């Protein structure tokens, strides 16, 4: 899923 707050995919977290 894409994270609007960071501009990156939440899978990277």
UniProtKB/Swiss-Prot annotation:
Record EC number: 3.2.1.14
GO cellular component, one term: extracellular region
Primary location group: secreted
Domain of life: Eukaryota
Catalytic activity field: Random endo-hydrolysis of N-acetyl-beta-D-glucosaminide (1->4)-beta-linkages in chitin and chitodextrins
Entry keywords, A to Z: Carbohydrate metabolism, Cell wall, Chitin degradation, Glycosidase, Hydrolase, Plant defense, Polysaccharide degradation, Secreted
Any one Gene Ontology molecular-function term assigned to this protein's record: endochitinase activity
Task performed by this protein: Defense against chitin-containing fungal pathogens.
Name by which UniProt lists this protein: Endochitinase 3
